[in-house]
Amino acid sequence: MHHYDMNLNYIDELLWHFCYDADPAYLRKMWPVLKLHLEWEKRNWDPDGDHLYDAYCCIWASDALYYNGGAVTHSTAYNYRGNLLAARIAEIIGEDPKPYANEAAAILKAMNETLWIDDEGHWAEYKDLMGLKRLHKNAALWTIYTPIDCGACSPEQAYRATRWVDENLPRIPIKVASPTGVV
């Protein structure tokens, strides 16, 4: 079975729109969508309440990618940003921001305690839910750029993680013919 769960992507795009056009009328109109999305994410992808979210085909690079219920960095980062901005939107439209601010803070704490590998300077791809509950340290590129894009890191973490990419992820050599020779 192959399909995508693009709720995270749609809501992330919607939140970026809100950052550039915080029209209170539109925020109010879309509030139920955001609220129901965050409830759905919590119910389906964080059923144990540890503030670390599972992921199933929820990013563009994720053809048949599933973590078997584990705690996944990229989906957790998206949910951090979703809750953080939901708290800000709630304040603007007169709703209670506390549940969203509390969840965002708990997500960030859980990410730092469980998924951040301090001695290597990057996030783990995920942590197993079952069995030995191993931390999978071989992170994909999206595991680095998503927390940075979502603001789920300190400036030092962002720097260290991008340095880890430079030093550890393989590169595909590309040679291009140009008027001055092969580049």
Predicted regions located by residue number:
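Residue-level detector of functional hotspots within protein domains
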Residues: 3, 10-12, 65, 108-109, ...
